[in-house]
Amino acid sequence: MTLNDFHVSEPYTLGIELEMQVINPPGYDLSQDSSTLIDAVKPQLTAGEIKHDITESMLEMATGVCRDIDQAAAQLSAMQHVILQAASEHHLGICGGGTHPFQKWQRQEVCDNERYQRTLENFGYLIQQATVFGQHVHVGCANGDDAIYLLHGLSHFVPHFIALSAASPYMQGSDTRFACARLNIFSAFPDNGPMPWVSNWQEFAGLFRRLSYTTMIDSIKDLHWDIRPSPAFGTVEVRVMDTPLTLDHAINMAGLIQATAHWLLTERPFKPQEQDYLLYKFNRFQACRYGLEGVLTDAYTGDRRRLADDTLRLLDNVTPSARKLGADSAIDALRLQVKKGGNEAQYMREFIADGGSLIGLVQKHCEIWAGQ
């Protein structure tokens, strides 16, 4: 399979994708009716796109190319309104969160889509288990070499992005003890985690060619790396965040990634090296397991530091870039979140500790997404 040339796009432009849960009240399990909902809302869209994801209990909201987080917020808000109206008419609910807390993967129906059916053939039950819900953020790049540099730079902050967005403590009716259990679902996939090391776009093209020899990779979309280049869009796509419970938090996470990309490409604070990834999976695990209370270990010095403290340092570093991009409100909101010491996974556990049920938790998530 030949790799597309890297499409030239305007640096730092944004695209946001949100994988949403389609809920069936009053039991608040996942519905299998996303196709009905998607067909109802598509004719009403004026910007962005609403489409299928892997299974019939999922739908994806995707913006077009946006200059800044305000434009992205406007597009997502308009889609949110249309979806909620259609969901109400069809007696369905919509919510965020990285996992549904008590759905059974065996009940999930893979969409009648050629690509997803081929993926089901390749990966079997793993695809049904991948009924989990993430936020993806695309950032525009001028060329392929910049994209590879940006990918390596952003990889330093994968634990930070995970910890800030963690919203998946419950799965299959149980507390997993993880802040973000969603990413564990992909651990059995052969392309889980970081992209194999390359130093420029030419080397990446060679890597992709070799991956295509496996017959399991037909396009970039078939690769499940934490961060991947998207040559057709001219972007780098960050894929490690849980879908937030609110649109505001989704916008804040996108603003952080946009500002971090600007800081990385203008300041060039790192010289990427393969050794940067030696402890990548250990630090990623700390973020998934403990959220902001996790501990990062430096691959070169062995120094250890709290993820919360290092996240505050990242927010300080990218603040000037955020101001230039109009994303400073996002950085301010995330800084406040870190100082308060929580994420949405912690809120979910507090809800249950206060006597709530998992059914009640999903109902509450639907109310939060609807702004009630």
Curated annotation (Swiss-Prot):
Identify the enzyme class.
ligase
Does Ligase show up as a keyword for this record?
yes
Q: What's any GO biological process attached to this entry?
A: modified amino acid biosynthetic process
Q: Does Ligase appear among the keywords?
A: yes
Q: Looking at the record's lineage, which domain of life comes first?
A: Bacteria
Catalysis: reaction(s): L-cysteine + L-glutamate + ATP = gamma-L-glutamyl-L-cysteine + ADP + phosphate + H(+)
Could you list this entry's UniProt keywords, alphabetically sorted: ATP-binding, Ligase, Nucleotide-binding
Pfam (any one):
GCS2
Q: Which GO terms describe its molecular function?
A: ATP binding; glutamate-cysteine ligase activity
What is this enzyme's EC? 6.3.2.2
**Protein family membership:** Belongs to the glutamate--cysteine ligase type 2 family. YbdK subfamily.
General function of this protein:
ATP-dependent carboxylate-amine ligase which exhibits weak glutamate--cysteine ligase activity.
Q: What NCBIfam families does the entry give?
A: gshA_cyan_rel, PRK13516.1
The record's note on quaternary structure and interaction partners says: Homodimer.
PANTHER family named in the record: GLUTAMATE--CYSTEINE LIGASE 2-RELATED (PTHR36510:SF1)
The name under which this protein is listed is Putative glutamate--cysteine ligase 2
What species is given as this protein's source? Salmonella schwarzengrund (strain CVM19633)
This chain is encoded by the gene named: ybdK
